[in-house]
Each structure stands twice: as structure tokens, then as C-alpha cells.
Regions:
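Short cytoplasmic-facing helical segments at TM-TM junctions of multi-pass membrane proteins
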Residues: 71-114, 137, 141
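Transmembrane alpha-helices
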Residues: 58, 62, 94-128, 151-155, ...
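Hydrophobic alpha-helical transmembrane segments of polytopic membrane proteins
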Residues: 137-175
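Short helix-capping/hinge motifs at transmembrane helix termini and TM-loop junctions
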Residues: 16-21, 49-51, 63, 131-133, ...
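Transmembrane alpha-helix signature in integral membrane proteins
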Residues: 1-15
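Cytoplasmic-entry segments and transmembrane alpha-helices of multi-pass inner-membrane transporters
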Residues: 11-47, 70-74, 85
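Short cytosolic juxtamembrane segments of multi-pass membrane proteins
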Residues: 176-187
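Hydrophobic/aromatic residues within the transmembrane alpha-helices of Major Facilitator Superfamily
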Residues: 2, 36, 49, 61-65, ...
């Protein structure tokens, strides 16, 4: 689900950035949708997909894609205009401009947006699992609640936090460190 949300978020973010009409009319809608808690998508997903994996997938995508789209648009906007002007002055095409100037310049902020999108996707997955009948940490949490087993509830919450820390340290921190090292920004 997260991979689909990333692709969708990048596409929407690029479209919003590239077309002023979308920037003016679609971005406010996306900002509004982004503020919805993921659990709000659960009733729609159950009505459309039933109590299925597709329902959870839908909640994960809706919970994170719009956050990623906004971060892509903002990351590109925050690239210093002088970089683009210099590249265009030297004869860069639009493709070369994005490939060699804009994307590398916005990469650190983009990674931060991916990290935020992942945290939204992770929360959405938990809310989807809590509301549907799938097997996973969310359902294990609900089972603990139903059995009034505080130890199970606490353990599941600790596992959820540990998975979040592991993803941050094992994926995003490694990616950020590589980018910073490649740019000579680390000791």
C-alpha cells in the first residue's frame, strides 16, 4: 500500500507543481483531505471493498498519498530559483532540469516527506486492521482489548513503536545519511 501511495503521491505532487490550475484548485482540496484521520476512510473502504485486504490497502493509500503529494510539491517549491535559472541559461531541457537540478536539490526534503507519508501509512494500516477482520497487529490489539488483557495491548503497542523505530533507523536514516554523505555534508 505504501509503495502505491508513494507513486500516487509523487505523480499528484508533480502535477500540482507543474500546472498552476491544479495548484490553485486541487491543492486546497488535497490539503483538506490530508487532514482527515485515516480511520475516516475505513467506512468507505468497507462499503466499497467489504472486509478485505483491499479495504485496508485503500485506507493505507488514502491515509498517506496526499501527504506525500503535498511534500513533493513543497520540496520542489523550496529549490532555490537561481539553480533552475542557471541550468536553463546553460541550455538545459526541462527533463535535464528536473533530472540534474530539481530532483537532486529537493531530495532531502522529499525523503522527509516519504518518512511522514510512511508514518501516516503505518497508522492507517493499524486503523484499517482494527476496523476490519484481517489478521495483524491491529486485530491483535483489538483482541487484547476484548479480552481485557492489558499485557497484550501494551505488548502490541510496544511492537508497533519498535517497528516504527526500526523502519526509521533501518530505511530512512540510512537513506538520509547516504544522501548527506554523497553531498559531502557529513563528517
Amino acid at each position: 500500500g505504501y509503495a502505491i501511495a508513494v507513486l500516487l503521491g509523487i505523480l499528484i505532487g508533480l502535477l500540482i507543481h507543474h500546472f498552476p490550475y491544479l495548484q490553485k484548485n486541487l491543492k486546497p482540496v488535497i490539503l483538506g483531505i490530508q487532514t482527515l484521520p485515516s480511520v475516516c476512510w475505513v467506512p468507505f473502504s468497507i462499503l466499497w471493498f467489504g472486509l478485505s485486504t483491499q479495504a485496508i490497502l485503500f485506507v493505507v493509500i488514502m491515509g498517506s498519498a496526499f501527504s506525500i503529494a503535498i511534500s513533493v510539491d513543497n520540496a520542489i517549491k523550496n529549490v532555490q530559483p537561481i539553480y533552475s535559472k542557471a541550468a536553463l541559461t546553460m541550455g538545459a531541457s526541462q527533463r535535464q532540469l528536473y533530472q540534474h537540478v530539481i530532483f537532486p536539490a529537493c531530495l532531502p526534503e522529499f525523503i522527509t516527506g516519504l518518512k511522514q507519508g510512511w508514518s501516516f501509512a503505518w497508522r492507517a494500516l493499524m486503523s484499517g486492521e482494527v476496523m476490519t477482520t484481517s489478521i495483524g497487529l491491529g486485530q491483535t490489539l483489538i483482541t487484547g482489548r476484548d479480552l481485557a488483557d492489558i499485557n497484550q495491548v501494551t505488548l502490541v503497542m510496544i511492537v508497533i513503536v519498535l517497528v516504527g523505530i526500526a523502519i526509521d533507523k533501518g530505511v530512512f536514516s540510512v537513506l538520509e545519511a547516504r544522501i548527506l554523505k554523497k553531498r559531502g555534508l557529513t563528517a
